[in-house]
């Protein structure tokens, strides 16, 4: 028998009758047990001095009221452009799977916790490359062992090996993982366009 609290919608199972307070509590517990943002921000803080007075583009800046953007980490950048596909958040609109409307090229592009929400991954990677200056850097982070979120647009979980193949046109500068090797919760890659 199926629980009255879980509704099967297509292949995704979602909670449907739980009060928002309970769902928020569950989200907080998940973020404590499976952190992705804290390790990512530690990594970004460690590299931020290298990007002083340079141009930075952030893909998927998200809701700044809950500190999803990394702008505060790169306060020493010459230019920090925030983008999102949700134009109601007040950022510049950018869909990295479509024709790019941005003329500038960037020294660093941040694409953190975004790729798992993009179905047309090859177009996204091609456009990330387009947005970088020659020898520019790209930070990509993706969750691995992590609950579904932002449904129904949570499509992928990438292994380290898949990311290496997908970004084979880039030079890998750094690979970080959170969790243990066989059960990583997140991957963080620093690539260089070459």
Where are these predicted regions, by residue range?
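Conserved SAM-binding loop
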Residues: 54-149, 160-161
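Short alpha-helix
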Residues: 154-170
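Conserved S-adenosyl-L-methionine
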Residues: 171-181
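Class I SAM-dependent methyltransferase Rossmann-like catalytic core
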Residues: 18-50
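Core SAM-dependent methyltransferase catalytic element
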Residues: 181-194
């Amino acid at each position: 028998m199926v629980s009255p609290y879980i509704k099967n919608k297509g292949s995704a199972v979602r909670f449907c009758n739980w009060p928002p307070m309970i769902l928020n509590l569950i989200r907080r517990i998940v973020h404590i047990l499976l952190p992705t943002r804290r390790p990512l921000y530690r990594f970004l803080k460690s590299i931020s001095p290298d990007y002083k007075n340079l141009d930075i583009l952030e893909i998927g800046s998200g809701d700044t009221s809950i500190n999803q953007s990394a702008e505060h980490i790169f306060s020493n950048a010459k230019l920090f452009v925030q983008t999102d596909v949700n134009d109601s958040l007040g950022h510049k609109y950018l869909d990295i799977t479509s024709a790019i409307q941005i003329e500038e090229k960037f020294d660093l592009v941040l694409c953190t916790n975004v790729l798992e929400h993009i179905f047309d991954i090859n177009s996204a990677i091609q456009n990330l490359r387009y947005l970088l200056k020659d020898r520019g850097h790209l930070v990509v982070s993706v969750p691995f062992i992590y609950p579904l979120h932002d449904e129904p647009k949570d499509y992928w979980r990438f292994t380290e090996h898949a990311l290496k193949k997908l970004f084979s046109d880039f030079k890998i500068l750094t690979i970080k993982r959170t969790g243990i090797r066989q059960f990583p919760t997140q991957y963080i890659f620093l690539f260089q366009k070459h």
